[in-house]
Amino acid sequence: MKMQTKKLFITIVSFLLYAPLFLSSPVPDPESVVEEVHKSINASVAGRRKLGYLSCTTGNPIDDCWRCDPHWEQHRQRLADCAIGFGKNAIGGRDGRIYVVTDSGNDNPVSPKPGTLRHAVVQDEPLWIIFQRDMTIQLKEELIMNSFKTIDGRGASVHISGGPCITIQYVTNIIIHGIHIHDCKQGGNAMVRSSPRHFGWRTISDGDGVSIFGGSHVWVDHCSFSNCEDGLIDAIMGSTAITLSNNHMTHHDKVMLLGHSDTYSRDKNMQVTIAFNHFGEGLVQRMPRCRHGYFHVVNNDYTHWEMYAIGGSANPTINSQGNRFLAPNIRFSKEVTKHEDAPESEWKRWNWRSSGDLLLNGAFFTPSGGAASSSYAKASSLGAKPSSLVGPLTSTSGALNCRKGSRC
């Protein structure tokens, strides 16, 4: 056990010497960061030794933080301390009580019934929302979330599908974990409640799986997405401090839009981490499509695309590290990247770089800008693992089949 602990310690430290772990912005005193990291590693290793965790770790820092605990259902809110990247400070409903959803039907957008998911998410208090049993929830209108909420699907098979889906609008500290989100439709031209004290008229929604509109400190982890009317996950209108991790995405065209428009300057402060996701079967483009802002795309598995994987316009900074890109068997779709809506004379100054990516089946990444530009400091949020480890790091992406009383 001592040798195993020593190896784990050395492995983690070696990564951290070359890349800042869990930081969303550069820091003036790197030595203080190293000291803090040492404390975190020591605490983590000690805790895992005590609980016998070392034998089940995978190298995925999010999963290794909680999945080895056979009593995870008794410690649900510890998940909030496992986030990484730019959304690492999203605590969701960690400091609130547990709310159990018991009713999968009876969705009333204005007067939600207690026990329904809508009743839970509009409350003012922090809540950690779980589900009594397996259920499929078909919403009549978009589910407008209030701040400091966690939707935690572990222990049940929870599907939100067949209607409008989740909206995170001008709120903060949201965690969405362990649910299936698919076949989302447009809603709107209707009254919808957003808090216990307010409901209002909603225009037509886009039909996204998760729409983040002016939201901050958002973490979407271990969800399965497919086949929505617009995007699977879109973040626009000044949204920032977001981590999208361990998700499995399939059967969709425009997967992920990050940034409202080329002219919307508030998105210049957007920071998003995209880590340990599997972009799978039936996807076409936008994994993601970025505007303005800073985007860290790290240790994802790209096994399918038809047009391109990563694209953008309006001078976004894209830091691609340790990903695996398997190009399709389409002659003119081998390029990972797409610089959009600008001539080469302009986009060649945008800061896009590939570092340690594995490019297969003829895949190629077209870099631009300065490889050592200082802007990458704002697009670095965790230490990348080698691309050779992407398979095991992403092998359990998507909603997990967690059962109480056993490791998840």
Curated annotation (Swiss-Prot):
A GO MF label: metal ion binding
Highest taxon in the source lineage: Eukaryota
Keyword Amino-acid biosynthesis among record annotations: no
Residue positions binding Ca(2+): 206, 230, 234
Keywords of the record: Calcium, Glycoprotein, Lyase, Metal-binding, Signal
GO cellular component: cytosol
Catalytic activity line of the entry: Eliminative cleavage of (1->4)-alpha-D-galacturonan to give oligosaccharides with 4-deoxy-alpha-D-galact-4-enuronosyl groups at their non-reducing ends
Cofactor mode of binding and number, as noted: Binds 1 Ca(2+) ion. Required for its activity.
Top-level enzyme category: lyase
Cofactor(s) essential for the protein: Ca(2+)
A biological-process GO annotation: response to nematode
Active site: 286
EC number: 4.2.2.2
Record bears the keyword Methyltransferase: no
Pathway: Glycan metabolism; pectin degradation; 2-dehydro-3-deoxy-D-gluconate from pectin: step 2/5
Family: Belongs to the polysaccharide lyase 1 family.
Summary of the tissues where the protein is detected: Expressed in flowers, but not in leaves.
Name used for this protein in its record: Probable pectate lyase 18
Entry-listed glycosylation sites: 42
InterPro entries named among the record's database cross-references: AmbAllergen, Pec_lyase, Pectin_lyas_fold, Pectin_lyase_fold/virulence, PEL
